UniProtKB/Swiss-Prot annotation:
One of its GO terms (biological process) is lens development in camera-type eye. It comes from the Eukaryota. Belongs to the beta/gamma-crystallin family. InterPro entries: Beta/Gamma-Crystallin, Beta/gamma_crystallin, G_crystallin-like. The keyword Oxidoreductase does not apply. The gene is GM1. Monomer. The keyword Repeat applies. This is Gamma-crystallin M1.
Length: 175
């Protein structure tokens, strides 16, 4: 179980809120968050309530200016704890939504689905084992999305409209 402390102002100033589990709407506890400390574990922060929209991955460390770190002053409204470790990792990725197009299966990190599988993009996936981060661009760059075991039939339904993913990485003991 992880632990994160949010602060209303930069440099760990102002009111604080301590969190050790998922929170679907952090605005219930504080009006804004401009810095945080991850004392243990890993967390994914989401731009909108109920784990929707743009995401940002946080591991153990201090984040003294969240707005500067996240693109264009993005604020976040919900947070999810990334539970680990998993010994097995397995995911099926599909080129199109709802099981469409080419399907490939992976059990390890993939820095480019174009190079490895000759797939133009990934728009649907089924995570059988482990927790993963999917990235918008090859070589683990760009916007990201956190996935835990389950079926993800349409990234659009998760508030990621127009997103396509080109690389994916397992969440192991990197937290």
């Amino acid at each position: 179980m992880g632990k994160i402390i949010f602060y209303e102002d930069r440099n760990f100033q102002g009111r604080s809120y301590e969190c050790m589990s998922d929170c679907s709407d952090i605005t219930t506890y504080m009006s804004r968050c401009q810095s945080c400390r991850v004392e243990s574990g890993c967390f994914m922060v989401y731009e909108r309530p109920n784990f929707m929209g743009m995401q940002f991955f946080l591991r153990r460390g201090e984040y003294h200016d969240m707005q500067r770190m996240m693109s264009m002053g993005m604020m976040f409204d919900s947070i999810r704890s990334c539970r680990y470790p998993y010994r097995a990792f397995r995911m099926r990725i599909y080129e199109r939504e709802y099981f469409g197009g080419q399907m490939s299966e992976l059990m390890g990190d993939c820095d480019s689905i174009m190079d490895r599988f000759r797939m133009s993009d990934c728009m649907y996936c089924h995570v059988m084992d482990g927790h993963w981060l999917m990235y918008e661009q090859a070589h683990y760059r760009g916007k990201m999305m956190y996935l835990r075991p389950g079926e993800y039939r349409s990234f659009r339904d998760m508030g990621m409209s127009g997103m396509r993913f080109m690389s994916m990485r397992r969440i192991t003991d990197m937290c």
